[in-house]
Amino acid sequence: FFFLRCNQQHHVLGVENSDNSSLNHVAFHVEDLDAMMRRIGVMSNAGYEPLWGPGRHGPGDNCFCYFEGPDSFVLEFTSELIEVPDGEEWTPKEWIPGPENANVWGTGGRTEKAASLSVPIA
């Protein structure tokens, strides 16, 4: 698993080895944690409960919350992603997926459904 960036955000795209070609989810970056919590409220009021979150990822140090949309596609709301200013020295780190860094807060347990949802790329 590795992250790619094309601007100052820590990551814009995550790529992982898989047995099938698929797009796991799309993330919508919002201005701050309060805005993310408001989006969670809007989704919950519309009948959508979180698949995973709210929480905070280790890589990127961003807050997150994942939902399944009406077409079973996974949507993420995220805020507070680390920014790496142009010209600033940055040392890449190895990230080994696990519960201790996937959600450093230890809240909003990931459901089995969250792990299984993906949309094949045609």
Positions of PLM-derived features:
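Core segments of cupin and vicinal oxygen chelate
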Residues: F1-H10
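Long C-terminal interaction/binding lobes of large macromolecular proteins
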Residues: N20
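Vicinal oxygen chelate
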Residues: F28-L75, S79-A122
